[in-house]
């Protein structure tokens, strides 16, 4: 590099250091993209911009990557370590292809031809200042590159809203070996790079935004809304103009009013907020979503719903991953001042709880959603329909998902891909309200006062987690499961073919399973699981650390799913972090520390335990079986677990099929044996008295679930002809009674939805016949197996209410073998 150029770069770097604060995507490019800093890297940028080059250089030095300003010297030949695909625009002329890039690619390919050991990494990098998509009808294309004057103002105003996006490398060795080294390959490389950068920019910026009134005019002109307006005028006996005005009013109520400036401002506010409230936001598998966006997919984000914070957190995360914040389906209850107008500008569109009896509303909403897909906007909706009050996934509401498929049946949309997302927190600000609502309190309507009260509670929120699950391409799904789906395409009428409902139900279930597959274990939910497993809600520090280690080893050595994330910290680090959250009490004595979960916190902590209950349910069930039997064969264990697995699978959205269950249980058994929680004697599994305490705590994780199943099965066995409504109601009443008598502090224990799912599963599995009567022989077999795993007191409470005298005289389960006295782990007892 010449001396003058060095001086020029140094002078240019001074204002850039002050004005530019760019974000790197991905956050750790070396590990996430598999870069090898020891091998030569050729940086490829879209067009000639010294500001972009110096911004890239600053990030490369921060990431310990080679300096793009230092040339590469290979086999005595010195070549630049960066290349611009285009020359870039000048103030008075638009850009033209820069042939130097083709020549440089050709020179590098030639070096590979002459040196078989050489393998240069070609690393595409784009630097963006600002993310405004622009408005439709404006003459300047939003994908334009900037000339020198425009770049100056972009850096001045948007230097702190910039990012450096590293892409996956291309091996020049592979290119040379597979495609040759002549000039046509160099031309092809340059052409592919141009397409890559164009797609990448579109994925980051999104399509142009329409003027709101222009959008309404287009919707009004659609055949479906024209027909709905005519029907509205006829059915309500009003004029066509009045019916049309009703449609416009509904559009005003529904439609977002997306503003890039609002997003940019909210990013500043949220960055400040997250940094003060949270100790970190952990994001996993975002690269798969970036790739989908770059490949031109229409993305529908379907996260679980824990808190009102979800809306803001997910948009914030996506924005910082270099993606366009989505249009978000929000409940109409959030459309209050000032939140409603703010959310609208951040991309929210509002949806009523029910569409029943309002054909015009359902048509307008469906057409608006279809228009979002047609224009290429990403969309987000919560498939559960509302926030989970228990910490578990709710049964999915399929209305919006059904409309998504109906949008495909209009024809003409890009490929739609559903992206399940797990959102987790170490502290949910509404958890106290949830507990009150589950105890019968009436849900407060959202308003400004409630929002301000909630903001007052925002402190010490620990860590947040956003895990992107395995994407579900709709076209691929329909091609596999409904090959004839294209026969139903109709651009005017909303179609409801016979296959739609079963397909939507299956898709919804798959989404929930994939959300659970991407669950995040953390300090709070692991500590809550251990302490709630102790009847006294307290453990010594040593016992709690031992139990945390048991959970961590299970999750690491026998992982639930490839997308599940487990903390990489030690049990000591996790416990110290949890104690800093001020949810637990520590009582010190001369022997050591006792960690206590206070009574008033116990119900709240079940929320966090329930977030990961599905990860530990099968190990807990194995532990429970071994605890009771003391000695059991693998075959017998598999048989017993297989009887109740369909209920667990439906309730907790587990991903193992019946065919996968034996292998899964073997893997878990091997891990429990490795931890010496049980002894594997080949054909038999035997209790290990020396490790009974952690086994006992592990077994407690499934205790309440089995008791709930026993309640319903005992009622079915006692009254085989009981109808579904009565069965669910009686089960809930008995569960409430059991929770009072035996101190069960879990609100979901008598949750209506849980019993509804259980009864539906019993019918599907053949425990209830087509006539509606229970098959007593089957229900008694499962009940006897379950009741044997419960304490005599709990069993007596259930049977005293549900089982008639003659049923109680049925042959009993084998008598519980004597077990050594295994006192509860030491800790503070309840007063």
UniProtKB/Swiss-Prot annotation:
One of its GO terms (biological process) is fatty acid metabolic process. It catalyses: sn-glycerol 3-phosphate + an acyl-CoA = a 1-acyl-sn-glycero-3-phosphate + CoA. InterPro entries: GPAT/DHAPAT (IPR022284), GPAT/DHAPAT_C (IPR045520), GPAT/DHAPAT_LPLAT (IPR041728), GPAT_PlsB (IPR028354), Plipid/glycerol_acylTrfase (IPR002123). It is found in: Cell inner membrane. A motif (HXXXXD motif) lies at residues 304-309. Pathway: Phospholipid metabolism; CDP-diacylglycerol biosynthesis; CDP-diacylglycerol from sn-glycerol 3-phosphate: step 1/3. One of its GO terms (molecular function) is glycerol-3-phosphate O-acyltransferase activity. It is an enzyme of class 2 (transferase). Keywords: Acyltransferase, Cell inner membrane, Cell membrane, Lipid biosynthesis, Lipid metabolism, Membrane, Phospholipid biosynthesis, Phospholipid metabolism, Transferase. It comes from Yersinia pseudotuberculosis serotype IB (strain PB1/+). Belongs to the GPAT/DAPAT family. Its EC number is 2.3.1.15. NCBIfam families: plsB, PRK04974.1. The HXXXXD motif is essential for acyltransferase activity and may constitute the binding site for the phosphate moiety of the glycerol-3-phosphate. GO terms for cellular component: plasma membrane. Disulfide bonds: none annotated. This is Glycerol-3-phosphate acyltransferase. Residues 801-831 are annotated as: Disordered. It is a peripheral membrane protein. The keyword Chloroplast does not apply.
